[in-house]
Amino acid sequence: MNKKKTILLVMPANFGIYKAIEKNLVFNEFNVITLAYDESLFIYPSLITRLQTKFRRYIFRDKNAKHNSKSKVFQKTSQFQRISQQLTEVGGADYALFIRADIWSEEFLRNIRQSVKKDMIAYQWDGMNRFPQVWQNLQWFDRFYVFDPKDFHGESYQFLPITNFYLDYPLEDNSITSDFYFIGSHLSDRQDVIIKF
């Protein structure tokens, strides 16, 4: 009997999409360890940490100061400690799938990399230039998927094409109450296109 492969799923908790992806990975016989991060819950642990971050951001012009502070604070949370413990218990993950790789600091990615036996894979569900921090994190991934055709042209990094999510687990028989819906973040420059659709 083959042992199930373990995959670490790391992504934002936005809209609960991680639950569907996690369910699909389980359906495809993966042991899934999920790290769903809710950025909206971030608070600085102290006034000093907040002031140090602001100082780095404005005096040293460190554009990543807040980003790095968030990542460091997160690594001290019980959620991160739980994930680390789970990875230790299973002897590390076979794979890691990151959606929105821009959220994490290099230190965090380096720590996770040490727990992954095979491939670390990323998917940037927004265009690469919407969250420019992602460019600094490319080195940590074996494969990097993007959906926006603009991201394929003119870059030295070899991106791989992918569409948005395809979930192949059996769906519940729900009656349809609408014929069109949109799940995503509101961007005013997309509004006219959606209305005309």
Language model features: what each stretch is:
Residues 2-53, 67-68, 75-83, 90-91, ...:
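Nucleotide-sugar donor-binding catalytic core of glycosyltransferases
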Residues 56-69:
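Aromatic- and Gly/Pro-rich amphipathic surface segment
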